[in-house]
């Protein structure tokens, strides 16, 4: 047994499930660890580092923006808050209080716990939740009906990619994106 486990009286884990917060999330790969070694003993303006990381990540992923966060839950909360507030400081400072469109559309089967509750991460931003479909199924028609019924409330839509979601009868990401784009929902 590894010395680390003995010193701290911890039980070793054999991970056969993938990335899971409850067992330490991810093991840092060697490339990332080398990057940490380069910067760990230096002070740096975090805004500059965040901007640089955003540019590199968004370029690599071919997205309009990207941001490094502490976890998936933090990413959900911060993304929803950013969609709501954009660069309006008064909205940023008022969070989690939101006015106007403040609901997130999400498939009912995507409100899972992956080490943190998706529902809680959404609510921490100040947003409300509008679910669509059933726990084990969601159709294109379900999404369209939910959007048409709640169009004046929806701030954005959320699609959760996780092995905790039941993919059987879940709406495909591309279809979800196509429908939301048609209604101009981020």
Q: Across the structure, where does each feature detected by a protein language model lie?
A:
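Conserved PLP-enzyme active-site core in the AAT-like
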Residues: 2-23, 27, 54-57, 62-65, ...
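A glycine-/small-polar-enriched, mobile loop at the entrance of the PLP active site in fold-type I
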Residues: 14-52
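Active-site/ligand-binding surface loops and adjacent short beta/alpha elements
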Residues: 68
